[in-house]
Amino acid sequence: MRAQWMLAPLLALLLVATNADVAAQERVIQVTAERFKFTPGVIELKVGVPVVLELTTLDRKHGFQVPDLKIDEVIEPGKITRVRIVPDKAATYDFHCTVFCGSGHEEMAGQIVVSP
C-alpha cells in the first residue's frame, strides 16, 4: 500500500511532463487575410502533427472556411481567431473567404496541403 502512495506523485509528474511535450510540439502558423488574399496562400502540414492557425485580418472582416475539415470562422479586425487542427490523412484541402469583402472576393482562396 505504501508503494502505491509513493508511486502516485511520480505518475502525476510523468503526466504533466507528457502534456508539456505535446504542447511544445504544437506548431503555430499565422494566417493573414487582407484585400482578396490569404498569406500564406498554401499551408503545408503533416499528418498527426497538431497545429494552431492564428487567423488575423489587416483590413476588414473576412471568413475562413475549409469545408472538408469542418472549419468555418469569422476573422474580426483587431482580434486573433485560433483554430486547432490535427490532420488525420494526407490530402489537399481548399479554403476560402466566406464574408463578401468587395470586387475580387471570389478570388480569395488557398490550400492546406497535408503530407504523410
Task: Locate each region found by the language model.
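A mature extracytoplasmic/lumenal domain signature
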Residues: A33-R35, V49, T56-D59, D68-K70, ...
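N-terminal edge beta-strand
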Residues: Q25-P50
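Bacterial N-terminal signal peptides
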Residues: A8-A17
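Generic detection of short hydrophobic beta-strand segments and adjacent strand-loop junctions
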Residues: I29-V31, I43, I71-E73, V83-I85, ...
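Sec/Tat signal peptide C-region and signal peptidase I cleavage site
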Residues: T18-A24
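N-terminal, post-signal-peptide region of Sec/Tat-exported proteins
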Residues: E44-R82
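Extracellular/periplasmic metallocenter environments
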Residues: A23, I75-P116
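Bacterial N-terminal signal peptides that target proteins for export
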Residues: M1-P9
